[in-house]
Amino acid sequence: MIRHRLTALALAFGASFVPFAPACAEAPAIHTQVPGYYRAAVGDLEITALYDGYVDLAASVLLNANKAEVQRLLARKFIAGEKVQTAVNAYLINLGGKLILVDTGAAKAFGPTLGFIGEQIRAAGYTPEQIDIVLLTHLHADHVAGLLGADGKPQFPNAEVRVDQAESDFWLSEANAAKAPKDFQPFFKIARDSAAPYQAAGKWKPFSGAAELAPGIKAVPAVGHTPGHTAYQIESKGERLLILGDAVHSHAVQFARPEVAIEFDSDKKQAVATRKKLFAWAAKEKLLVSGMHLPFPGLGHVRADGKAFAWVPVEYSPLRNDK
């Protein structure tokens, strides 16, 4: 009897001390990516990669290789399907006294997956109004349309814009636009519209050849993709970054097969020759390189691989001061 009472008391005592278990609310999925910026150092300079967004390109735009070979190379990188997600990047260079932006993204020229350069600049701790110089690799819409904001006004009102003279002459010519295929004519208009307010303000300033555009920043003529396509070399304290522009569109295909052109190249033979030359230079000199269509942040190295090349992306890293 006593044992039964003790058991009952123990059960009652234990029941009164059931630990409180708070109700757990469901955690909804966020469905958005983290801000698209990434910092790296080149000597004393701080480089910020900016993610404008992405565009899905058909694998069929890659030329000089049969479809089976292209699909094989894509599959090696676990890229499946006919559409290939392709990043659109830009790069912000902090010189200490000046801020220089290389390319401006697509604005909304290619739909809602692009056009986030202004947003990423702010997320990175700057404002578009702080940009002193915009360097353009070329005047295709996904590089120049971001000169204008959503309101149609200059997104970088305090910046002067530098671009190769031949590139400027070609794309801003109404005569060239009239001779172009009809479905390509809108891209001439985008270039003209993007440049117009900067021209009116006296801030559109073309250069020629291998010009030095700021301390440690040189233009590297890289024609072929367009008539005045330009790469840029950034140098500080013996360290160098080569911004390739559109010398490469597909990391999965064009490093392994640098002879593969893309439908958008204005001079495909020259574009291939330029790509091979830039890749060989980057590999020999062990340059840090970046590209506007390499997977974000688009920073890495080029390694020689027989008669071809391999892309070696950088490891995510803090900005170290212990070197």
Language-model features and meaning:
Residues 32-124, 231-248:
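Conserved beta-strand hairpin/beta-sheet module of binuclear metal-dependent hydrolase folds
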Residues 20-25:
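Sec/Tat signal peptide C-region and signal peptidase I cleavage site
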Residues 111, 231-233, 237-323:
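Cap/insert and terminal regions of metallo-dependent hydrolase folds
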Residues 52-53, 104-107, 139, 166-167, ...:
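Active-site metal-binding loops of divalent metal-dependent hydrolases
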Residues 8-19:
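Bacterial N-terminal signal peptides
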